Swiss-Prot record:
Location in or out of the cell: Preautophagosomal structure membrane; Vacuole membrane; Endosome membrane
Source species of the chain: Candida glabrata (strain ATCC 2001 / BCRC 20586 / JCM 3761 / NBRC 0622 / NRRL Y-65 / CBS 138)
Record's keyword terms, sorted: Autophagy, Endosome, Membrane, Protein transport, Repeat, Transport, Vacuole, WD repeat
SMART domains the UniProt entry points to: WD40 (SM00320)
Annotated family: Belongs to the WD repeat PROPPIN family.
PANTHER family the record matches: WD-REPEAT PROTEIN INTERACTING WITH PHOSPHOINOSIDES WIPI -RELATED
Complex formation: Component of the PI(3,5)P2 regulatory complex.
Membrane topology, from the record: Peripheral membrane protein
Protein name: Autophagy-related protein 18
Description of its domains: The N-terminus might form a beta-propeller domain involved in specific binding to phosphatidylinositol 3,5-bisphosphate (PIP2), leading to the association of the protein to the membrane.
Compositional bias (Basic and acidic residues): 368-379
Acidic residues: bias regions: 335-348
Residue ranges with Low complexity bias: 349-360
Length: 505
């Protein structure tokens, strides 16, 4: 009999983008990115979550339910080096997401977030949240910041850190979502390590509803609620820090920078990407991905916070450059005129727009660069050539007008463009809806002899190497794509290599 086709249920990079974890209908696999190769696999049933802790031997596994021992409600922590199970914890409902850093493990259910101490798997906190069917959360890799982010206001935060310590009920003003009012309440949440979690707190729905400040007219109050709020939560003190009004629509993707100082967000519409400071909550950057709605799959910063990559359902990866402006902008949240829910965006697909003073964001080197952005010959179409020419004229006009008008006006005049992009070499007719994730690596040197297309007539001198930025993309088809980006020129990313995970196990 022919072997049954293997399905991919989970695919992700580790925190540094150096390894890939994969869950399939047959088992799970771990790959090294450079050099590419499989270094661990286990054929023991279907897995829906396979999360790594950096490049350590610690793995968090959740099954798909095809076997009694692989329930989607059971979290299993294993040590791949010792081939041992560290612990197992069963939850009341299906596990949607698991995130780890060196001090915390976060387990996300549809309406709860469980926070554990990674050193002893002691339950520290349980956060009751509004329904989060996608299990969308972000956890900072850096334990110095140690932040958690999740969409929508929470109902109740309960804890059993110490038996005599009361925890907080958070009341959020839905109109602006800025005031966090703490009311003490004793919670008796019981946790038995390695067994089913019992005694979960019964939520008083009436009190939870009264925790929100609403108008007498319920319908009007509900219509005024922004569903794109993001809670920033301190994982060290186990207290909420702030509410960021990121978007008017529901959050589709969010992620922290490596140091935890920035957080990027995208709404379900997928046209606007925003970057906020996690210390002040201020919006620092705003990028426009394009006109047409699309599903955003991932947001990823470079480790030096210079670049932000965005993957989406169009199989295009956009890379935006976060230009340092010398001082932090303090523009508002989702109520700006260029909101992603306004419905009047008419720039072309694969475009971006920054937010703030044009003269500060666009330097002379950006406008009159002596080295034009690299253009991939396979993507050189008449439409792209016309659009690039138009963007150059727009940038010059915006720079001139930006010196005459205030910031609010110049942010509208600012040109729409991304810094770099790439298009995956997949057959759209066959691939269908391919999910992609991206990771930006550290700068490396590329030899001229191996890649002469990176050196054109505009380059001066006898250079034999050029500094490039590696861009890694993995797809739900089971492929790893290695691209490089010129961090000074931008433009199209160049495909260096492509590998298949060959999930025949």
């Amino acid at each position: 009999m022919p072997n049954k086709a293997v399905s991919i249920y989970y695919l992700n990079f580790n925190q540094t983008g150096t390894c890939i974890s994969m869950g399939t209908s047959n088992g799970f696999l771990i790959f090294n990115c450079a050099p590419f190769g499989k270094f661990y696999s286990e054929d023991s049933g279907g897995y829906g979550i396979v999360e790594m802790l950096f490049s350590t031997s610690l793995l968090a596994l959740v099954g798909i339910g095809d076997q009694p021992m692989l329930s989607p409600r059971r979290l299993r922590i294993i040590n791949t080096k010792k081939h041992s199970i560290i612990c197992e914890v069963t939850f009341p409902t299906k596990i949607l997401s698991v995130k780890m850093n060196r001090s915390r493990i976060v387990v996300v259910l549809k309406e709860q977030i469980y926070i554990y101490d990674i050193n002893n798997m002691r339950l520290l906190h349980t956060i009751e949240i509004a329904p989060n069917p996608e299990g969308l959360v972000a956890l900072s890799c850096n334990t110095d910041t140690n932040l958690l982010a999740y969409p929508s206001p929470p109902k109740v935060i309960s804890s059993d850190i110490n038996p005599n310590v009361n925890t907080n009920t958070i009341n959020i003003a839905r109109s602006k979502s800025e005031e966090l009012i703490a009311n003490s309440k004793d919670n008796n949440l019981q946790n038995k390590f390695g067994t089913t979690l019992e005694g979960q707190q019964n939520i008083d729905e009436d009190k939870a509803a009264n925790g929100y400040q609403v108008d007498q007219n319920t319908d009007t109050a509900e219509n005024d609620i922004n569903s794109g709020d993001v809670i920033i939560y301190d994982m060290s003190t186990l207290q909420p820090l702030m509410v960021i009004e990121a978007h008017k629509g529901e959050i589709a993707a969010l992620n922290f920078s490596f140091d935890g100082s920035l957080i990027a967000t995208a709404s379900e519409k997928g046209t606007i990407i925003r970057v906020f400071s996690t210390s002040s909550g201020a919006k620092l950057y705003q990028f426009r991905r394009g006109t047409y709605p699309t599903k955003i799959y991932s947001l990823s910063f470079s480790q030096d916070n210079r670049f932000l990559s965005v993957t989406c359902s169009s199989k295009t990866v956009h890379i935006f450059k976060l230009t340092k402006t010398g001082e932090e902008r303090t523009s508002g949240g989702a109520d700006d005129a260029d909101s992603d829910d306004s419905g009047n965006e008419n720039d072309g697909d694969n475009n971006s727009v920054g937010n703030g003073d044009v003269s500060s964001l666009l330097s002379d080197n950006d406008i009159e660069s002596t080295r034009e952005p690299y253009v991939d010959a396979s993507r050189k179409t008449m439409g792209r050539m016309i659009r690039n020419s138009s963007q150059k004229l727009s940038r010059r006009a915006a720079k001139t007008l930006g010196q005459l008008f205030p910031i609010k006006v110049t942010s509208i005049l600012e040109p729409s463009r991304h810094f770099a992009s790439l298009k995956l070499p997949t057959d759209s007719n066959i691939s269908g809806n391919v999910k992609t994730l991206c990771s930006i690596g550290n700068e490396m040197e590329v030899d001229k002899v191996e890649y002469p297309e990176l050196f054109d007539g505009q380059d001066q001198g006898d250079r034999t190497k050029v500094t490039m930025l590696p861009i890694r993309v993995i797809s739900s088809e089971g492929y790893l794509y290695n691209y490089v980006l010129d961090p000074e020129r931008g433009g199209d990313c160049l495909l260096l290599s492509q590998y298949s995970t060959a999930i025949d196990q």
